[in-house]
Amino acid sequence: MMFFRPVFALLFLACISMGASAETIGPADKTEFQRIIAGQITAFRADDGPAAYDFAAPVIKNIFPSPEIFMAMVKQGYPQVYRPQSYNFAETLLDPTGRPIQNVTIIGPDGKTYTAVYTMEKQPDGAWRIAACTIVEIPGVDA
């Protein structure tokens, strides 16, 4: 199960390196990013794999082809988003390739503070989905 984290990190890097057109992030987009991320965290907390999986972009679903496999990966490699003590939305930015990212400050189940960097991807139907998530521990900051 430990292979999931490197796979997810590689997926994140692959997504960043893909040629993507720059998005313009408006207030409605920011609100939608936060709704999606909060919805997925709520689904994780309820152990509702199908609901959590619905927020994932196709690139994630291609690597983790079922809600059960996806949830196993999240439980093993991303306890901070699977069972956060708390979370707050931080800045919404564009990554170097112009893709929108939503930063989330998380207090993990271990009491440590993390930044979750969510890369968002607009689908052909106009809906936003989570294309990647990278967790970075904030050293020296504990809850």
Segments predicted by a language model, with ranges:
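Sec/Tat signal peptide C-region and signal peptidase I cleavage site
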Residues: 18-22
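Short helix-capping and inter-helix turn/linker motifs at the boundaries of alpha-helical repeat units
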Residues: 28-32
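Positively charged n-region of N-terminal signal peptides that target proteins for export
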Residues: 1-6
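Bacterial N-terminal signal peptides
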Residues: 7-17
